[in-house]
Swiss-Prot record:
SMART domains: REC, Trans_reg_C. Its main location: cytoplasm. Member of the two-component regulatory system YvcQ/YvcP. This is Uncharacterized transcriptional regulatory protein YvcP. Gene3D superfamilies: 3.40.50.2300, 6.10.250.690, Winged helix-like DNA-binding domain superfamily/Winged helix DNA-binding domain (1.10.10.10). The gene is yvcP.
Length: 237
C-alpha cells in the first residue's frame, strides 16, 4: 500500500481528497503540524506528497525544498494559483507535477497513479540491468540513490531529473524528441505544460555544470535534445 502525505490547510478539501484517496487503497496522512512539514514527512516516510502552496508559516515551495534535503519522493503540488510562473516555480523548487484548483478528483487520481508507476512501478526508468552502477565517459551513475558522480563530486537529483538523466544515458549520443521525454516522464503529454520539460532539463543541465560537466546536453532546434559525454581530461567533457 502506497503512503501519501497530504499537506492542505483547507480542512474541507483535505477531508474530501483524503477520503477519496483511501477509497482507492492508499494510506493517507493529513499533515497536522503545518509549522514543520519536514518533521511530518520524516515521521511518515511517505511514497508521495500532495502539497498545497498557500500554507501558514511557510509556503509549499519552502517545504518542497526542505523535503528535497532528505528525500527524492515525488511531490505533486495542488494549488489555486493557475499562472504559469507558479507552475514553473513548483518544478524549479523540486516538484514533480502540478494540479490546479478547482480539480476533478479523477484527474488527481490519474496523476498520482502515473507518478507512482513511473517512480516505483513498471514504468520506472531503468538503466542497464547488468549493473546497478553505470559508468559513462567518467560519469558514474548510482540508480539506487538517484545520484551521479563526476570528478569525485557527488550530484543528487530529484526524481524527474534522474529520470531524464536515465533516458539520456540510455540514448547516449542519440537525439531524443521532446514528445518522447514528455510521454516517458509524465505519461500523458496533453496534461503537461511544455515549459515543465524545459525547466527540468535546465535543472539537470545546471546540476551537471555545477559539478564541472559542461556542454553535455545540447538542444537540437526543432528535434529535441542530445546527451553526450566524451571524457577529455579531468576538467571537461
Amino acid at each position: 500500500m502506497y503512503r501519501i502525505l497530504l499537506v492542505e490547510d483547507d480542512e474541507r478539501i483535505a477531508s474530501l481528497l483524503g477520503g477519496h484517496l483511501q477509497k482507492y487503497g492508499y494510506e493517507v496522512k493529513i499533515a497536522e503540524q503545518l509549522n514543520d512539514i519536514k518533521l511530518e514527512f520524516a515521521e511518515m516516510k511517505p511514497d508521495l506528497v500532495l502539497l498545497d502552496i498557500n500554507l501558514p508559516f511557510f509556503d509549499g515551495f519552502y517545504w518542497c525544498r526542505q523535503i528535497r534535503t532528505i528525500s527524492n519522493a515525488p511531490i505533486i503540488f495542488i494549488s489555486a494559483r493557475t499562472d504559469e510562473l507558479n507552475q514553473v516555480m513548483a518544478i524549479e523548487n523540486g516538484g514533480d507535477d502540478y494540479i490546479t484548483k478547482p480539480f476533478h478528483l479523477e484527474v488527481v487520481m490519474a496523476k498520482i497513479k502515473s507518478v507512482l508507476r513511473r517512480t516505483y512501478g513498471e514504468y520506472s526508468p531503468s538503466l542497464p540491468q547488468e549493473s546497478r552502477i553505470v559508468e559513462l565517459g567518467g560519469l558514474t551513475i548510482y540508480p539506487d540513490q538517484n545520484e551521479a558522480e563526476w570528478n569525485s563530486v557527488r550530484i543528487l537529483f530529484s526524481q524527474k531529473e534522474f529520470q531524464l538523466l536515465s533516458i539520456f544515458v540510455r540514448e547516449h549520443k542519440k537525439i531524443v524528441s521532446r514528445d518522447e521525454l514528455l510521454e516517458a516522464l509524465w505519461d500523458d503529454v496533453d496534461f503537461v505544460d511544455d515549459n515543465t520539460l524545459t525547466v527540468n532539463v535546465n535543472r539537470l543541465r545546471r546540476k551537471l555544470e555545477n559539478a564541472g560537466l559542461t556542454d553535455c546536453i545540447s538542444t537540437i532546434r526543432g528535434q529535441g535534445y542530445q546527451f553526450q559525454v566524451n571524457r577529455k581530461d579531468e576538467a571537461e567533457c
